[in-house]
Amino acid sequence: MMEAVYPHTNEQDAARAFTGQSGIFDELYGTDTIIAYKRQRVRSHVLQLLAPGSNILELNCGTGEDALFFAGKGHHVHATDLSEGMLGQLERKVRMHGMDSVISFERCSYTDLPRLKEKGPYDLIFSNFAGLNCTGELDKVLASFSPLLKPAGIVTLVILPKFCLWETMLVFKGKFRTASRRFFSKSGRKARVEENYFKCWYYNPSYVIKNLKESFELIGVEGLCTVVPPSYIEGFAKKRPKTYNFLKNREDKLKYRWPWRFIGDYYIISLRNK
């Protein structure tokens, strides 16, 4: 298959950054307690919406942890990413676990999704952990979803909003830059992975709903790491296990409520194709 060639974009910058980190990505993040909590929350949300044997299109698949999980639950996953390094890690895992028949993958930009229509239609389009925050053209990306889905197909996205309560409170620790980085970010804010820089944009649930309202109906929004601290507050769960478990229980009760569903590090949003 001919490899797609993409012009230089911010998405390319992000892909280059994550390619540089791909070899150690799982080592860095695979054992983190709060990251494991986030994955469990997202996966539980998705599994409630999927019929057996669903056909999933995954965006920004990374090293393939979610692809392997959903394939292991009996679904077929077509995993995409623009990072060659991340796809290399996914390919290694697919071969190691003998999942060639249930996981396919290819390099694809968010803005090139329409060419995947012939490989669909899909029951679910899934994007985890803020991959879509790496594009300043989210409106165009969202506009490409409906033709890729079956009637009543689902979109589930995990996105960074414009306000995070925990992050804003870091101002009291003197971390002014981190505490304010989501503010005034209309033109994107600089992010760094290792020594590579790219821009990050923040989008509230209302933005997603507005851009999809013609073709989709909202299923629900839940806050993620809204009471539980973000995973970049290193060692929190290990240093304060009782507090962490208490906060987990509180988040489980509050994740669907206002304002908690809107003020987390992320939100999980699902919509159904009309």
For the regions a protein language model found, what residue spans apply to each?
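A short acidic, Gly/Pro-enriched loop at the edge of an enzyme's catalytic core
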Residues: R115-I125
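A short SAM/SAH-binding and catalytic strip from SAM-dependent methyltransferases
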Residues: L124-E137
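A C-terminal cap/extension of S-adenosyl-L-methionine-dependent methyltransferases
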Residues: K210, G220-K274
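Short alpha-helix
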Residues: N196-V221
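Class I SAM-dependent methyltransferase SAM/SAH-binding core
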Residues: T63-D112
